[in-house]
Structures are given as structure tokens and as C-alpha cells.
A protein has these predicted regions:
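Activation of the activation-loop gatekeeper triad in protein kinase-fold domains
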Residues: 69-73
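Acidic, serine/threonine- and proline-rich low-complexity regulatory regions
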Residues: 112-122
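ATP-dependent phospho-/nucleotidyl transfer catalytic cores
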Residues: 1-50, 59-61, 66, 123, ...
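Hydrophobic HxD+1 residue recognition
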Residues: 53
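Short alpha-helical "patches" and their helix-cap loops
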Residues: 23-28, 56, 99-103, 144-158
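ATP/Mg2+ or Mg2+-diphosphate-binding catalytic cores
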Residues: 134-185
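Active-site activation/catalytic loop segments of kinase-like enzymes and analogous catalytic loops
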Residues: 7-17, 78-112, 126-143, 155-162
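Conserved protein kinase catalytic core
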Residues: 58, 75-77
Length: 185
């Protein structure tokens, strides 16, 4: 699911960027980079993944947190929903707050290999935010819902924050440095 959904970035955002679409090989290169990121996911066991796990889909019910909007749930990587929650484009939080949530989560769930979990968390956050940029571009272009465009700069900021240090993002970092981001969709 995440790999195919990441291609929404290619199909909509890159298509809106005339400079890149004039050079078809750039789309192929970015697809290969996305595919390689997906292949670098380390955790192979699957768990329930809500896929739309964010504060707006949580509510208190009988003194417990309940989730709504789970019709698109799948079996997938255990880091996906946490990446959705921590790097949600609709809610701006500090990097220290994000880091603290991740630390608390890891302390509660006792993963055997925390570095594998963090690796997957970062990759899934980036892939998910690329997907979101693609979806928001599609909403603007196809459905004339332009209100989501204002969230794209923060999605880029979330991506930039995640790709800084992880060596898995070397090729993506180079691609993004060499190719301009769309200023207006």
C-alpha cells in the first residue's frame, strides 16, 4: 500500500512541475529512489495499521482513547501509524516533542532492535509525506480544493527534517537539491 501510494507524488506533484515532466528520466529516477527506500524497510512482521492515524481520528470514550475512520486499515509495518501521528502535516509541533513521543513509544513497546524501528519510522514518514503532497496536489488540480496547498510547505519541512541524517536518504536528498520544488500549483 505505501509504495503504490507514494507514487501519487510522482503522478500528481511531479506532473504539476513542468520542468521535471519535460525530462521523463527524472520521474524514472525518483521512482527508483522511492522503490529503494521501500526496500530499505527492516521490519518484516505485519500488524494492524490504521493508515489514517492522527489526532482528528482519536476521541475520548468512557475514559479511553477510541479511534474512528479505520475502514482503510491494513496489515503493515508497525512504524507507519506512529509516523502518521508524529509527522502529521495538520499539526505543527517541535522536534523535541516529536522525539519525546517516539522515545515514550519505544520504551513502552520494547522493540528488540530500536534502530530498525527508527529506520522504518523515518522512511515511512518520508514516503507518507510524499504521498500527502501528491494527494494535496491532486485535490487542487482535479477537485479544485486548493485549501490543502497551504499544508504542502510543512510536509516538505517534515521530509527535510527526516532526511538530514539517515544515510538511506542520500539519493533522495541529492534529487531534491538538484530539482526545484513547485512554488505555485
Amino acid at each position: 500500500y505505501i509504495l503504490e501510494e507514494s507514487y501519487l507524488f510522482l503522478d500528481w506533484y511531479l506532473a504539476a512541475n513542468k520542468l521535471i515532466t519535460q525530462k521523463g528520466h527524472l520521474k524514472k529516477n525518483l521512482k527508483k529512489i522511492i522503490d529503494n527506500l521501500y526496500l530499505n524497510l527492516k521490519i518484516k512482521h505485519k500488524v494492524f495499521v490504521h493508515r489514517d492515524f492522527h489526532v482528528s481520528n482519536m476521541m475520548f470514550y468512557k475514559n479511553k482513547i477510541a479511534l474512528i475512520d479505520s475502514q482503510d486499515a491494513v496489515l503493515g509495518n508497525p512504524a507507519y501509524d506512529l509516523a502518521s501521528l508524529i509527522d502529521d502535516v495538520r499539526i505543527k509541533t517541535s522536534n523535541s516533542f516529536k522525539s519525546n513521543i517516539l522515545k515514550v513509544f519505544l520504551s513502552k513497546f520494547n522493540y528488540k532492535n530500536e534502530s530498525q524501528f527508527i529506520n522504518d519510522f523515518e522512511i515511512l514518514s518520508v514516503l507518507r509525506n510524499l504521498k500527502i503532497i501528491g494527494i494535496f496536489t491532486r485535490l487542487a488540480k482535479r477537485d479544485k480544493k486548493r485549501k490543502y496547498l497551504k499544508l504542502i510547505p510543512y510536509a516538505w519541512k517534515l521530509i527535510d527534517n527526516r532526511i538530514k541524517l539517515n544515510p538511506n536518504f542520500h539519493d533522495l536528498k541529492n534529487f531534491l537539491q538538484k530539482n526545484p520544488r513547485i512554488k505555485k500549483i
